[in-house]
Design a protein with these regions (language model features):
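Conserved ATP-binding/catalytic motifs of P-loop helicase motor domains
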Residues: 1-234
């Protein structure tokens, strides 16, 4: 249950665990509804015990008149604790550390400036600065964030052209959370893109690999779980 929930979110609650437990036990038959609820409770209790509690403990004990029947404080929402896991927290730590490291390949200042401003891809000043920043940052993990319509796709297209010009054809790898999204990303960038889960499956079996100098673009990264993002960036 914890592993399944962690694929969908980095932080979860009692109710997330309850929903996943109900989903996984849906095909099991019980004599009564009470039996099903009792088993679900046991599964959720075990899942919470395997999780890391993020919600800080209460600093003081509430008076009895402010406690529920189970002894919890009425000043806190019932089952309002937030949870995560060691695997997710460690993956998050590695991602943050990589965002601080500036040992990754770059594009030379002259090439980045010419390619982002020479008209191959029409860019606004903001898009050009974003593209140049990523090309020259040297960070192992970098971000391009913006609202819909801000021109992220156009910036990524210019970034792909710049990077390929410096590091050669095939030096840009595109990943996306679904096959349809990967197809759309590939059409936008002009390179072959893969579903992230499929790419990792192929990577685990030695059917694909990353080499130094390659730029991995993960589109819609907020839709990917933390552990999945940790793997190709390592």
């Amino acid at each position: 249950v914890v592993a399944a929930v962690a694929v969908k979110r980095a932080v979860w609650t009692h109710w997330n665990l309850m929903a996943e437990a109900a989903k996984q036990t849906m095909d099991l038959r019980f004599a009564t509804t009470e039996d099903r609820e009792a088993v679900l409770g046991l599964v959720v209790d075990a899942a919470q015990a395997r999780s890391v509690v993020l919600t800080p403990p209460e600093l003081a004990v509430s008076p009895v008149r402010f406690q529920r029947e189970d002894g919890t404080s009425r000043f806190r929402p019932r089952h309002g604790e937030k949870y995560s896991s060691i695997a997710v927290l460690e993956a998050e730590g590695r991602l943050l550390a990589r965002a601080e490291k500036v040992t990754a390949p770059t594009v030379s200042v002259g090439v980045a400036g010419r390619a982002c401003g020479n008209g191959k891809v029409s860019l606004t000043d903001q898009q050009r600065r974003a593209g140049e920043s990523i090309c020259r940052s040297g960070r192992q993990v970098d971000l391009l964030v913006g609202p819909a319509g801000a021109g992220k796709t156009t910036t990524m297209r210019a970034l792909r052209a710049v990077w390929s010009g410096e590091h050669g054809w095939g030096s840009v790898v595109g990943l996306a959370p679904s096959a349809a999204a990967a197809q759309a990303l590939g059409d936008d960038l002009g390179v072959a893109c893969e579903n992230t889960s499929k790419w990792l499956h192929e990577y685990d079996r030695g059917r694909t690999e990353l080499r130094r100098g390659q730029l991995v673009i993960v589109d819609e990264a907020t839709l990917a779980d933390t552990v999945t993002l940790d793997r190709p960036t390592g």
